[in-house]
């Protein structure tokens, strides 16, 4: 059952050292005075894939269905989820030009993660001083740094 009274704020970001290259994602989940930071990464990936992973992992971390305000600085994620996704599904995961949707598995995972929740998507300008977006970016970069130092992702 969807908890309409519990509204979660989520801030997500992805980063890549080389594109493609070593990548990280970060997310901040906030409910009232409670806050949780998540981060992780992948050895060989793209920035867009990490942006998607940040949202997927944040949504999947929630144990119950909630109302969510999700903030991303990715125009790709915002447009994909808000403008393109329904048509991709109707067109058997093909774009309007009939080519296969890039990152289809991640889009499908995001669609599935969203299905449990009432998600309102918000775009924020990246690297423009928004404190929570900057923190999500720092978490994504932390994942990359930790991998370089340890040889694995700790997050």
Curated annotation (Swiss-Prot):
The UniProt record lists the keyword Magnesium: yes
Q: Which GO terms describe its biological process?
A: DNA replication, removal of RNA primer
Gene Ontology cellular-component terms for this entry are: cytoplasm
What is the E.C. number?
A: 3.1.26.4
- Location of this chain's protein in the cell: Cytoplasm
Spell out the protein name for this chain.
Ribonuclease H
Q: Which Pfam families match?
A: RNase_H
- Which amino acid positions bind Mg(2+) 1, per UniProt? 13, 51, 73
Please name the CDD domains in this protein's record. RNase_HI_prokaryote_like (cd09278)
Q: Is the keyword Ubl conjugation in the record? A: no
Q: Subunit comment for this entry?
A: Monomer.
One GO molecular-function annotation for this sequence? Answer: magnesium ion binding
What the record notes about the co-factor is: Binds 1 Mg(2+) ion per subunit. May bind a second metal ion at a regulatory site, or after substrate binding.
Gene3D superfamilies recorded: Ribonuclease H-like superfamily/Ribonuclease H (3.30.420.10)
Family statement drawn from the similarity comment of this UniProt entry: Belongs to the RNase H family.
Tell me the cofactors it needs. Mg(2+)
